Each structure stands twice: as C-alpha cells, then as structure tokens.
C-alpha cells in the first residue's frame, strides 16, 4: 500500500528533481565558474541505483520526476537511466536541458514518450547568449528548440532575466512565444552559489518584468495548480498571443505550496533547493524509507531561506 508524504504544514510531496550529474557543456554566469571541476562518473549514482530509489519513492507518493543537471543529456548512461525510469510508476517524466545535445537524443526521447522539456534559453540575441553561457551554441540551441517544437514536444523556455544583460529582450521573448506557440517563463535571478556575486547588479523582479510587458501587452491570468512554481498569463498585443510565466523565487517565493524533493547525483535527498544536506539514500532499504522520509519532510521549511552558497549545477534547477 502506498503512503503519501505529508509534512507538518500540510504539503504533500509529489515531485522529485533528480540531479543526474553536475557536469555541463555551458558555463552560465549565474550557475558556475568557467573553471568548475565536476564529479567523476564513478562517484555518481548508477542507473540501477536510480531506478531502485525512484521505484521506492513512488511507494511514498512521488508521481513526477524531472531530470536536471548540470546537463542531464551529457550523462554517459543517459539512455540507460531514461529507459529504466520509463518502467517506474510515474505520471510524468520530464527533462530540463540546455538543448545543445537535444538533436542527438530527440528520436530516443520520442521512442520513450518523453515529450516534456524545459529548455534554458536566456537570450534571443546571439552575442548576449554567448556572454551569458560562455559558449557559441546559439544557433544549435535555437534550431533544436524549433525542431522539438515542430515534433510536438511540450516545451517551456526558461529565461533568467538580468538587468543590463537581457532585460530589454522581454518583448522579443513574447513575440517569439506568439510566433512559435511556445511558453516562455521569466525567472528571477536567485541568491544561490555563483549568482550571489551578480545579484545586486543584475536582479530584476517579476513585477518589473510585468510592468515592462504591460506597456505593450494585455495580460490575462491563467489558473495554476497550488504547487506550481510559476504564475502564468496569456499576453495579447493585436493579433499576437503569447504564453508566459514567472518564477519569482526571490520576490514571490512559493515555499508554502512546494511539493518537491531533490535527489543529488550521489544519492543525497534534500527537502529544499536552499538546503545543502539530507540523508544519503543510495543504499537505504525500502523498510527504512518511511522513517527517513518523514523525518526529512518535517525539516522542509515553509518560508524562503535567504541564500545558499551551493552552486546551482550541484542542486539541479
């Protein structure tokens, strides 16, 4: 019999963010330094360990898994891991990716019916994109986004908005959304790891973005689930119609409705993106899960912890 995980604040844990690895083929300015060193493959959870942990967690109400990184498509055993997870009792299996390797894996994703992608795409300007990511992959990423969209993937673009870098592109992102019928979500820069040094200079709030959008677009609120990380709108401007969302982790934190747990690439289960500790469940027998999980979720805060020094690629966004 399944056991639902409900914490002392009445939040039921339903979603797992699974950080496959900390390695990435970008060096986004808010995520990690350019000289970042990564964990060895031998130190990461094996595909069998991942399948066992996720299978066990489904017995405690976990219904959705999102693969994150680093860049999950870089994992040398990505296909083996994905195949294993498709056999777990999940309502949804999704991926957050930078799309550099998406074209290589797109047929495999289709074969395994994984059609939900959150794609990090911080700028529609190639020079700004290169500056943010420290790569020259703009055209590759853009073409992969459009190809996946044409193939029927459910795509959400994640754009971290930053003053004096990409904030002026807000209208362009809405036009892009309208043209391609792709949801664009504007993310606030978070006080996490590498981004701490940029926060004061580049932070832009969701309200500032909405104010800018409202100069040219009419906004209609879209109802969202209580545990949604974003609040969403349909934006219209003449014949243009854009689907947009806001993840306002700093100015409008959603901790009170959070239903997520986070599993590190080494097997550490964390109750919150801002907490860098938790039990390692890589070898935990199923008989001990109830006690371990219930102790963990009652350490899950219902308020926003101000900041953490752990890097985003080590947590998984």
Residue ranges of predicted features:
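N-terminal [4Fe-4S]-dependent radical SAM core
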Residues: 1-17, 27-29, 59, 230-232, ...
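Canonical Radical SAM [4Fe-4S] cluster-binding loop centered on the CxxxCxxC motif
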Residues: 8-48, 272-273
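Residue-level signature of catalytic and energy-coupling elements of molecular machines
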Residues: 20, 184, 267
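Glycine-centered loop/turn positions within well-structured domains
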Residues: 26, 126-127, 253, 279
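A short acidic, helix-capping loop that chelates divalent metal ions and anchors anionic groups
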Residues: 36-40, 125-132, 193-197, 280
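Radical SAM/AdoMet-radical enzyme domain recognition
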Residues: 47-67, 71-187
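Extracellular/luminal ectodomains of secreted and membrane glycoproteins with large N-terminal domains
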Residues: 189-191
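Accessory C-terminal segments flanking Radical SAM cores
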Residues: 193-307
């Amino acid at each position: 019999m399944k056991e639902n995980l409900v914490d002392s604040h009445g939040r039921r844990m339903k979603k797992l963010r699974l950080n496959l690895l900390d390695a990435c083929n970008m060096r986004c300015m808010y995520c990690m330094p350019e000289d970042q060193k990564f964990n060895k493959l031998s130190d990461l959870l094996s595909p069998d360990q991942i399948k066992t942990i996720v299978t066990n967690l489904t017995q405690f109400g976990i219904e959705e898994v999102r693969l994150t990184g680093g860049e999950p498509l870089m994992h040398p055993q990505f296909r083996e891991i994905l195949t294993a997870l498709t056999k777990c009792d999940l309502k949804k299996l999704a991926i957050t990716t930078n799309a550099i390797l998406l074209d290589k894996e797109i047929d495999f994703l289709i074969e395994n019916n994984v059609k939900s992608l959150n794609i990090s795409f911080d700028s529609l300007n190639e020079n700004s994109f290169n500056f943010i990511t420290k790569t020259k992959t703009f055209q590759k990423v853009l073409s992969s986004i459009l190809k996946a969209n044409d193939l029927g993937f459910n795509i959400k673009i994640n754009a971290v908005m930053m003053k004096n870098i990409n904030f002026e592109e807000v209208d362009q992102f809405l036009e892009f959304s309208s043209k391609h019928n792709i949801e664009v979500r504007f993310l606030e820069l978070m006080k996490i790891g590498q981004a701490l040094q940029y926060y004061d200079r580049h932070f832009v709030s969701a309200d500032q973005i909405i104010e800018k959008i409202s100069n040219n677009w009419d906004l209609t609120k879209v109802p969202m689930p209580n545990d949604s990380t974003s609040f969403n709108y349909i934006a219209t401007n003449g014949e243009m119609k854009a689907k947009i969302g806001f993840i306002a982790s700093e100015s409008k934190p959603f901790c009170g409705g959070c239903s997520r747990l986070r599993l590190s690439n080494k097997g550490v289960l964390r109750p919150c993106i801002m907490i860098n500790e938790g039990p390692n469940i890589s070898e935990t027998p199923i008989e001990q899960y109830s006690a371990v999980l219930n102790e963990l979720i009652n350490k899950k805060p219902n308020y926003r912890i101000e900041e953490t020094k752990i890097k985003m690629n080590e947590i998984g966004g």
